[in-house]
A protein has these predicted regions:
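Carbohydrate-active catalytic/glycan-binding domains of CAZyme proteins
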Residues: 1-164, 168, 173
Length: 173
C-alpha cells in the first residue's frame, strides 16, 4: 500500500507467474475501486492494471515508492528463484505516472521474458567472497523508506548459505 503524489491510496501486488498489478484503494473504506476493463491497456476490472510480468515469468514482491524530488515512482520487484547460482534478486524500474509504463535506466520496458537480467537496475543479488564460508543468496521481497535526514534505505530478506542449511534474515541497507 502506498500513496501517490495526489494523496490517492494504491495497492501493488502480484506473485510469480501471474504478473504485477496495481489497484486503487478507497482511503475511507479500505475497499478496492474497481477500474473499467481496458484490454488494450492491460486493465482488468478485478485484478487492476498489469504493470509488468505474466506469462509464467518469475517476478514477485512488488513495492512502489514516490520520490517527490524527482517526480518519479519507483517500482521494485524480485526476479528469479531461491537458488544459489544467481537466482533471486531485486531490480528497480521508474515511471512519471503511478500506473506506468515502468522502464529501466535505459528506457526499456521489461518484456515478458525469462531473461530478466536484461531489464531493470539490479540492486541486490547473490554473492560469495572467496575468503568466507558464508554467502548471501536470495535477496528480495523488499520495501524502501526515506529517513528524516533524506537517506533512503532498502529492507529485504536474504539467506545465508552455511555448510548444512540456509538461514533466513532481514536486512536494512
Amino acid at each position: 500500500m502506498f500513496y501517490d503524489a495526489d494523496g490517492r491510496m494504491w495497492m501493488v501486488y502480484g506473485s510469480w507467474s501471474g504478473g504485477i498489478f496495481l489497484l486503487e484503494i478507497d482511503k475511507t473504506t479500505g475497499l478496492v475501486i474497481h477500474p473499467e476493463a481496458d484490454e488494450a491497456n492491460n486493465v482488468d476490472p478485478y485484478y487492476g492494471k498489469r504493470l509488468l510480468g505474466g506469462g509464467h515469468i518469475s517476478i514477485e514482491g512488488p513495492y512502489i515508492m514516490y520520490d517527490e524530488a524527482s517526480g518519479y515512482y519507483y517500482l521494485f520487484v524480485s526476479y528469479g528463484a531461491l537458488t544459489s547460482n544467481g537466482g533471486y534478486q531485486v531490480r528497480v524500474f521508474r515511471s512519471k505516472t503511478v500506473d506506468g509504463d515502468y522502464v529501466d535506466m535505459n528506457g526499456k520496458y521489461p518484456e515478458k521474458s525469462a531473461q530478466h537480467q536484461n531489464f531493470g537496475l539490479k540492486l541486490t543479488g547473490n554473492y560469495k567472497l572467496p575468503s568466507l564460508e558464508k554467502a548471501y543468496m536470495a535477496t528480495g521481497h523488499n520495501s524502501a523508506f526515506v529517513d528524516d535526514d533524506g537517506r533512503m534505505y532498502l529492507v529485504y530478506h536474504l539467506s545465508l548459505i552455511h555448510i548444512s542449511e540456509p538461514t533466513r534474515l532481514a536486512l536494512i541497507s
